[in-house]
Amino acid sequence: LASILGGDRSTVAYSLEDMARDTVGLLDALAIESAHLVGLSMGGMIAQCVAIHDAPRVRSLASIMSTTGSPRVGQAKPEVLAELLKPPPPDRDGYVDYGVGVWRLLASPGFPFDEAKTRELVGRSYDRSFDPKGVARQIAAIAAARDRTPALAEVRVPTVVIHGTDD
């Protein structure tokens, strides 16, 4: 991650574009010609990449709590970034506590935070597919991503961007 943050983007093992290609591969495997794509955070970045590189596969795009990759917009608050860069605990209970803490930082202060529901969802995520190295690869993919703003200006499908000032 340090080399990527230093500007060497060649070291990323699994890029957002790779994940976008995997998304299209899933559509192919399911025999889905095109789809409405909705992505949250990194999922929004992946959906943007699909819309850029495989436009005919995208009926509409919803990018939620995400960014274009531009260093001028959509940057995480320092306390959120610091928490996201910490290695997650490997045990389930520690990971659930960590995940609840991250989601609490991401939640808008103007709305109630449902800790019990968040704890349940983070636990289900851990049970389904926890891989600490995967988390690091995802953070590296985001850090290595280039600014998609110029390419996104060419996207011609109905698009909605949902973001808040207190996220």
Predicted regions and their residues:
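Active-site nucleophile elbow and catalytic-triad environment of alpha/beta-hydrolase enzymes
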Residues: L85-P88, G134-A151, V157
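Short beta-strand/loop motif that positions the catalytic acidic residue
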Residues: V155, V161-H163
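Gly/Ala-rich beta-loop-alpha elbow adjacent to hydrolase catalytic centers
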Residues: G39-G43, A47
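Conserved alpha/beta-hydrolase catalytic His-Asp/Glu region
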Residues: D93-R137
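Residue in the alpha/beta-hydrolase core beta-strand immediately N-terminal to the catalytic nucleophile
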Residues: H36, R59-A62, A153
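Flexible "cap/lid" loop of the alpha/beta hydrolase fold
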Residues: I52, R59-P90, G134
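Acidic beta-to-alpha connecting loop that harbors the catalytic carboxylate
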Residues: T165-D167
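Active-site loop/oxyanion-hole signature of alpha/beta-hydrolase fold enzymes
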Residues: L1-V38
